[in-house]
Design a protein with these regions (language model features):
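N-terminal hydrophobic/helix-forming segments and targeting peptides
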Residues: 1-312, 316-441
């Protein structure tokens, strides 16, 4: 694992790359991300053959751009892919034509609200070609001239040059507990020259991984799986190739747009009032935040993970909306280190509670002889816990998680968990994992 001085410095390494769905620069991005992941995380890049059916979708081809520009018939260059990869519509078809302005205009894209900026436009599945430019440049184009549009692109279907995603796994103290399952943290990597959407979420996830590796979750907790790849189709392809993992996933967080100066927003799970929702709301009590419905804008891979036929409860964290979205103004200038770290902190607190939570089930009969087993809590040292002891023990029937119990008795989760652990160590309760809700059909 490479050391880093700031999350923004990591982002600066892959921000300028043309990291579209499947491309050489996307491969480089995954390699850069891997270099900063903890050495113990077994960071692995998976490759899927283009055009392979994955559920109702197909794995996309690798996209290669050799050259692309738009110029006047006199040779005056208007936009050039070499200057900025956003100048062409992502996954544009090859073209080499001389056109009138009227013929060219349907293939030109700009942002009305930000006339100085180049928009990011993609047509992954609606195959066409196009150029992106500032509205100010568009307005200056002579209407009576001819234009030369050149895009030398190809769609590679060689299985050896396939579509890639990456995963890493960080275990709790003492190693994995297979029965506890895994918690999934995702960030997508496929938006070229976009710093906040999506590079910021990637580096916040890297920071979360570092924290969980340096200060592991308690023994017996879930492992935390990190996933990096192209939005939507990346998760679909990964899950379609790894369906056996789905029942093992107990919850998830999708992270994006974490670097701008908005308050944090979280989107509920599809279940709406799931344990994961309650834990998130609990952890954000003292944080200025906004709460949103599942899959409200900006909806991303939680629609796959928590969608039909998968159903793993998943929230998302972001700082959307922001005016620079999907333009060249979404650059390093709008990224703030404290925002990146703040999002990692929020995610960490949610993960630490959810992944360490379990269901305690009693083995004892009758009230436990507390003082005889070192389980008495002196009221002079902790009045609140002393008054809650009976309530806690009455909830050891295997119907409540530790978080449920803490919520019901009105105490901090970690206070209650530490106390319940004493019962487990004495053999008075056994720990049972959070049940799987993942579907495989």
């Amino acid at each position: 694992m490479k050391a880093y001085t700031s999350l923004k410095s990591i982002l600066a390494e892959f921000f300028p790359l043309h990291r579209t769905l499947a491309s050489d620069d996307h491969d480089k991005t995954l390699e850069i991300v891997g270099s900063y992941m903890p050495d113990s995380s077994n960071y692995t890049i998976e490759t899927y053959a283009p055009l392979t059916p994955v559920w109702t979708w197909k794995v996309p081809e690798r996209y290669v751009v050799h050259e692309a520009y738009l110029e006047t018939e006199e040779g005056e260059r208007i936009v050039d892919f070499q200057d900025n990869p956003l100048h062409i519509v992502s996954y544009s078809l090859p073209v080499d034509k001389t056109l009138s302005f009227e013929e060219l205009q349907p293939h030109l894209y700009f942002n009305e609200k930000r006339p100085h900026a180049v928009p990011w436009i993609f047509k992954y599945y609606e195959r066409d070609w196009g150029f992106c430019l500032p509205r100010n440049t568009f307005d200056r184009l002579p209407r009576d001239k001819k234009y030369h549009a050149l895009i030398k692109s190809e769609f590679v279907t060689d299985p050896q040059q396939g579509f890639k995603v990456a995963t890493a796994l960080i275990h709790p103290a003492g190693g994995p507990n297979p029965g506890a399952g895994e918690f999934l943290v995702q960030a997508h990597t496929c938006h070229p020259m976009q710093a906040n959407d999506d590079g910021a979420g990637v580096v916040s996830a890297i920071e979360l991984a570092r924290r969980l590796a340096e200060s592991p979750l308690p023994a017996g907790s879930m492992s935390v799986r990190f996933w990096f790849g192209p939005e939507t189709i990346g998760t679909i392809a990964w899950l379609a190739h790894n369906e056996s993992l789905i029942p093992n996933l107990r919850g998830g967080i999708f992270m994006e747009m974490t670097g701008n100066q908005n308050r944090i927003a979280w989107h509920r799970t599809r279940q709406h009032n799931h344990l994961l929702d309650r834990i998130t709301a609990y952890q954000l009590q003292s944080v200025d935040h906004e709460e949103r419905a599942f899959a409200s804008a900006p909806a991303n891979d939680e629609r796959v993970v928590n969608g039909p036929g998968v159903n793993v409860p998943c929230i998302s964290l972001n700082r959307f909306p922001y005016d620079e979205y999907h333009t060249t103004d979404d650059n390093l200038d709008i990224i703030h280190e404290d925002m990146l770290l703040g999002a990692a902190e929020v995610a960490e607190q949610i993960v630490r509670v959810y992944a360490s939570n379990y269901i305690p089930k009693r083995t004892f009969r009758g009230p436990v002889f507390l003082s005889g087993h070192g389980l008495w809590v002196d009221w002079r040292e902790n009045w609140a816990l002393n008054r809650a002891i009976e309530k806690i023990m009455m909830r050891f029937e295997g119907e409540h998680t530790v978080f449920d119990i803490a919520e019901q008795v009105g105490l901090d989760y970690w206070t209650v968990r530490e106390y319940v652990e004493k019962f487990r160590i004495k053999g008075f309760v056994t720990s049972h994992p959070i049940p799987s809700e993942g579907q495989t059909s």
